[in-house]
Curated annotation (Swiss-Prot):
Keyword Iron among record annotations: no
Glycosylated residues, chain numbering: 279, 283, 324, 384, 429, 496, 652, 745, 753
CDD domains: AdoMet_MTases, M13
Origin organism lineage: Eukaryota, Metazoa, Chordata, Craniata, Vertebrata
This protein's name: EEF1AKMT4-ECE2 readthrough transcript protein
UniProt-listed InterPro entries: MetalloPept_cat_dom_sf (IPR024079), Methyltransf_25 (IPR041698), Peptidase_M13 (IPR000718), Peptidase_M13_C (IPR018497), Peptidase_M13_dom_2 (IPR042089), Peptidase_M13_N (IPR008753), SAM-dependent_MTases_sf (IPR029063)
Lumenal compartment spans: 200-883
Native species: Homo sapiens (Human)
Annotated transmembrane regions: 179-199
Gene Ontology biological process terms from the UniProt entry: brain development; cardioblast differentiation; heart development; methylation; protein processing
Lipid bilayer topology: Single-pass membrane protein
Length: 883
């Protein structure tokens, strides 16, 4: 429901606004409210939705104070927050709202004085106030001279809803959020802040004072303080010291297996995107942006999706040739089914095929083939059957349930799915572990299609690749890069000795996995049960709109990025980020010059490579050019009433886009991440580092934060990505992005000695009694350590040039210490034991705790600034250093 036009005054203003304190005034004002349009003080929900939603969770119990006849409570319900209780002083308006929203019994309405709330303790997670406290202050002479009675009244209400003086900021922590919007509370906060800012100006005028009292400094100091655990010595456990408070205040949200800064920022970005896509005045000249909204809205059509049920996938399976689990199937069509499943619909049974830059000739693209075909996150889940019995049973239950939902026979579905699972176990047996695939020189094999045919003769490769890359014409001499020759040879033998019915069941199972997320709630519910076992998620509370934002990001991510960038990105941030990268690059090269183990020839080549690293900040330029953006998605058709068909169209469109790349050179405009992504990456074949707009925000970066925090946040991320150019894999590529040996033998041997130290260091860390894999995480650990060192050296260089910064109030840290705390708090995280195990066996990164502890225990600068003695847990005595 819309509110009256902006700036329109309510029709019945009292002669004196102290009438706002009288219930009789409100009772009279709201006569007939059930039939009149709603009125929203300070604007309707849409005016602050993007700011509010990142602070809310769908399961929150929300209390709205002084609801009046506002549409806020109902719009919260429509926005995916169903647990809303609204109270008002006036019984007349409460009765009116109960009548107006009788069709929504979930909404609760109570007659109650906000000064005498009658709810049990801890009844609510969120309290919203928009204008009510202003009414309590009616009759004051002016907003700047509030009487002691007025202050007492506001204090009384804040106490009623749970604010505890001295223990939290006015806008609360997210553990039990009390969120007050507008009203006198914000006015009082603004007045207090104004006093602090004024005091800060005086401090700035007097150079003897070194405390920063700007609004930004006060806010960030509060966030840092509430994340710290002062009961722990920084030299005992710096992660707990930096994140203990954050962990206490951030219990794992329902439906999540992990929660950290990256998740929080992505939720925030999603809320902004939701606001943009659901804007009723959405009007874009870009066809790609219009497609984005149509795709998103089709995903939200839950009633239509439920109405269609499983039929869209059943029809697709029948079109391909049938499935032995659900009915008749064509027994002689292995190649045809493989082409449809892996080509048209982009699933990856047995292996994956893609087009990418040739590692040894990076200015050209080439067909690449690699191992694939497992549904569970890692081969370990299949092979360590005793430890993973619960997961394998849950997976088989999931397979059976989906087979039954699609028409499988009760008497045979589980037996046939067991055969598919056994085939996946055989695939896991021949799959090469990730920690044995880190030397790209060894796993890179370039050959012709005819040579590939001889290596893996169980299928017609020319026929398959020609179909996949249609309408391109291929011949037997077409080059292909194969990663893992032994795997392909063995998978070919496995195909030859497997019964056709099992092959068919496995191929269609891959298609089912790919498409069921587009089907009705029964399929989602089946998956939730598997995910609970696999990742420890207790229940799924992810609202549909968030799922749809993620789907839209996958399908039309750069068109979505265009909307995001235009709405949020500060162009000056790009210039500042580029300056920081330059400073960090300089610091890295200076450290390079001091390495005693590297010979001069290799050092010079390394410096040239560092100089040549190309940085991309924010977004690719083409997304702000409507015609160029439209061209990217030209040919992708969007149906307004079939989300399933939109996903099928996406797979088909993606296959055509891939084929189009083969005869073109790689382009720098082809980013691997969309602008709204909260992440960054280094691409060795382009020798480039990329920082999307999504990560260029607090706590990683903010223009008005101390430089210590910016260098400790986004600065370390920048140093991390730059160091990837010189980790155990990146160091194999030269400055042009080509995989070739450019190191002298002596320096290479020394490099391996230094990395062996780091590998062994991380091998010693444990999570829930399970050791980290120092080999699997080596590249990321090298980047973490090198990135921290480069960023800190860049910060010191900045200080030499600009002088010391003012310190944050109350935190009790020097700015050098603040740098390390800022770095650590970026990695504050909570995670289920099941998710922690999954990370240990699949993730090339170390767990968050050891990204902090491992890196800082190797940092002489950290140990010096915190005074950690040799023998303390943070200073074991031996430091592992590569860069």
């Amino acid at each position: 429901m819309a509110s009256p036009g902006a700036g329109r005054a309510p029709p019945e203003l009292p002669e004196r606004n102290c009438g706002y304190r009288e219930v009789e005034y409100w009772d009279q004002r709201y006569q007939g409210a059930a039939d009149s349009a709603p009125y929203d003080w300070f604007g309707d929900f849409s005016s602050f939705r993007a700011l509010l939603e990142p602070e809310l969770r769908p399961e929150d119990r929300i209390l709205v104070l002084g609801c009046g006849n506002s549409a806020l409570s109902y719009e919260l319900f429509l926005g995916g927050f169903p647990n809303v209780t609204s109270v008002d002083y006036s019984s007349v308006v409460v009765a009116a709202m109960q009548a107006r929203h009788a069709h929504v019994p979930q909404l609760r309405w109570e007659t109650m004085d906000v000064r005498k709330l009658d709810f049990p303790s801890a009844s609510f997670d969120v309290v919203l106030e928009k204008g009510t406290l202003d009414a309590l202050l009616a009759g004051e002479r002016d907003p700047w001279t509030v009487s002691s009675e007025g202050v007492h009244t506001v204090d009384q209400v804040l106490s009623e809803v749970g604010f505890q003086k001295g223990t939290r900021q006015l806008l609360g922590s997210r553990t039990q959020l009390e969120l007050v919007l507008a009203g006198a509370s914000l006015l009082l906060a603004a007045l207090l802040l104004g006093c602090l800012v004024a005091l800060g100006v005086q401090y700035h005028r007097d150079p003897s004072h070194s405390t920063c009292l700007t609004e930004a400094c006060i806010r960030v100091a509060g966030k840092i303080l509430e994340s710290l655990d002062r009961g722990v010595s920084p030299c005992e456990d710096f992660y707990q010291f930096s994140c203990g408070g954050w962990i206490r205040r951030n219990p794992l949200p329902d439906g999540r297996s992990r929660w950290n800064t990256f998740n929080s920022l992505w939720d925030q970005n999603q809320a902004i995107l939701k606001h943009l896509l659901e804007n009723t005045t959405f009007n874009s000249s870009s066809e790609a942006e219009q497609k984005t909204q149509r795709f998103y809205l089709s995903c939200l059509q839950v009633e239509r999706i439920e109405e269609l049920g499983a039929q869209p996938l059943r029809d697709l399976i029948e079109k391909i040739g049938g499935w032995n689990i659900t009915g008749p199937w064509d027994q002689d069509n292995f190649m045809e089914v493989l082409k449809a499943v892996a080509g048209t619909y982009r699933a990856t049974p047995f292996f994956t095929v893609y087009i990418s830059a040739d590692s040894k000739s990076s200015n050209s693209n080439v067909i690449q083939v690699d191992q694939s075909g497992l549904f569970l996150p890692s081969r370990d889940y299949y092979l360590n059957r005793t430890a993973n019995e619960k997961v394998l049973t849950a997976y088989l239950d999931y397979m059976e349930e989906l087979g039954m939902l699609l028409g499988g026979r009760p008497t045979s579905t589980r037996e046939q799915m067991q055969q598919v699972l056994e085939l996946e176990i055989q695939l896991a047996n021949i799959t090469v572990p990730q920690d044995q695939r880190r030397d790209e020189e060894k796993i890179y094999h370039k050959m012709s299609i005819s040579e590939l045919q001889a290596l893996a003769p169980s299928m017609d490769w020319l026929e398959f690749l020609s179909f996949l890359l249609s309408p391109l014409e291929l011949s037997d001499s077409e080059p292909v890069v194969v990663y893992g020759m032994d795997y392909l040879q063995q998978v070919s033998e496995l195909i030859n000795r497997t019964e056709p019915s099992i092959l068919n069941n496995y191929l269609i199972w891959n298609l089912v996995q790919k498409t069921t997320s587009s089907l009705d709630r029964r399929f989602e519910s089946a998956q939730e049960k598997l995910l609970e076992t696999l990742y420890g998620t207790k229940k799924s509370c992810v609202p549909r709109w968030q799922t749809c934002i993620s789907n839209t990001d996958d399908a039309l991510g750069f068109a979505l990025g265009s909307l995001f960038v235009k709405a949020t990105f500060d162009r000056q941030s790009k210039e500042i980020a580029e300056g920081m990268i330059s400073e960090i690059r300089t610091a890295f090269e200076e450290a390079l010059g001091q390495l005693v183990w590297m010979d001069e020839k290799t050092r010079q080549a390394a410096k040239e490579k560092a100089d040549a690293i190309y940085d991309m900040i924010g977004f690719p330029d083409f997304i702000l050019e409507p015609k160029e953006l439209d061209d990217v998605y030209d040919g992708y058709e969007i149906s307004e009433d079939s989300f399933f068909q939109n996903m099928l169209n996406l797979y088909n469109f993606s296959a055509k886009v891939m084929a189009d790349q083969l005869r073109k050179p790689p382009s720098r405009d082809q980013w691997s991440m969309t602008p709204q992504t909260v992440n960054a990456y280094y691409l060795p074949t382009k020798n480039e580092i990329v920082f999307p707009a999504g990560i260029l925000q607090a706590p990683f970066y903010a223009r008005n934060h101390p430089k210590a925090l910016n260098f400790g946040g986004i600065g370390v991320v920048m140093g991390h990505e730059l160091t990837h150019a010189f980790d155990d894999q990146g160091r194999e590529y030269d400055k042009e992005g080509n995989l070739r040996p450019w190191w002298q033998n002596e320096s290479l041997a020394a490099f391996r000695n230094h990395t062996a130290c780091m590998e062994e260091q991380y091998n010693q860390y444990q999570v829930n009694g399970e050791r980290l894999n120092g080999r699997q995480t080596l590249g990321e650990n090298i980047a973490d350590n090198g990135g921290l060192k480069a960023a800190y050296n860049a910060y010191k260089a900045w200080l030499r040039k600009h002088g010391e910064e003012q310190q944050l109030p109350a935190v009790g840290l020097t700015n050098h210490q603040l740098f390390f705390v800022g770095f650590a708090q970026v990695w504050c995280s909570v995670r289920t034991p099941e998710s922690s195990h999954e990370g240990l066996v699949t993730d090339p990164h170390s767990p968050a705790r050891f990204r902090v502890l491992g890196t800082l225990s190797n940092s002489r600068d950290f140990l010096r600034h915190f005074g950690c003695p040799v023998g303390s847990p943070m200073n074991p005595g031996q430091l592992c250093e590569v860069w």
